[in-house]
Amino acid sequence: MKDQFVIAYLADFSMTQEVVSHACHMARMLNKGLILLYIEDSRYHLPSVDEAEKTLLRLEKEHPDVNPAHVALKGNTREIINALPTLLNGVVAVAGIDTHARIGSLCNPKRVLHNFAQCKIAYLTVQQPLADPTPYSNVAFSIDFHKESKEKLIWASYFARFNHSRLRMLHFQYNDPGLHNKWHNNVLFMDKFFSGLKVTYDTLTVEGRALFPETIVCRTAADAGCSLLVSVTTDTRNRDVIEWFVGAQEDRIVRNPRQLPILFINPRNDIYVLCD
């Protein structure tokens, strides 16, 4: 019996295949259980818990290899998502993104980011079903001059260790000596962390400049054949004026036209170590 779970968040069942296919692979990769989660929230026009149970039971039978369980709850979507680590022993969630969904839809990109904004576990946003026979074979992440997220490196290492993924570290060229020094220190920190786990990576230089650098990182990762990007969301405590008015980087890469799955990690003060 598994005691930690990948959470397949089936918002309104409109992206069931997309979410479940990725969640099943994550459960196998991490050797965790799988929970199919449905939330009946009175603020949205959704099937009742009783109606949802029928679909959830059918989905359980369709995936005997991972032996999923299901949970159907009533309540506030965001509050339940925030409680996933303690409520369901969740370690990572998978959510579907529909770039054509109306703003009030639970699968609308902005709505997904809003509902997961305070989530303490990583969450994978997906736009299409997992069809690759070797899923996540190339996983990208970027290193810049900002304070490095150890949890991002931990998650990147999971893909290398448990999925045998090839890691691609993307970075910009910094002409400013101060920024270059900060970036170099982050690389040294990463190298020390990865060396202890015997994890290797390739480097890829990102060309160009943009108001939101992660959008170029996302495009470069897709062009390089990467099948997943690990990204840290903007700390709301540190947002500048531009970000408050035009949005943060995650608002753009979540709906990337190449449909690259994005594993988002919200900034947090503590580190949640999932696997040894």
Question: What are these model-derived regions, one by one?
Answer:
Residues 1-48, 138-182, 192-203, 256-257:
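Small/aliphatic-rich secondary-structure junction motif
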Residues 20-22, 80-84, 111, 155, ...:
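A short acidic, amphipathic alpha-helical/loop segment
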Residues 35-37, 69-73, 124, 168-170, ...:
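General small-molecule cofactor/ligand-binding pocket signal
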Residues 47, 105-106, 152, 178-182, ...:
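Short, well-ordered secondary-structure micro-motifs
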Residues 61-69, 197-204:
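A short helix-to-beta-strand connector/capping loop
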Residues 72-80, 209-216:
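Charged docking surfaces used in two-component/phosphorelay signaling
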Residues 80-132, 221-276:
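Gly/Ser-rich helix-loop-strand patches that form or flank binding pockets
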Residues 181-238:
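Glycine/small-residue-rich hydrophobic helix-like segments
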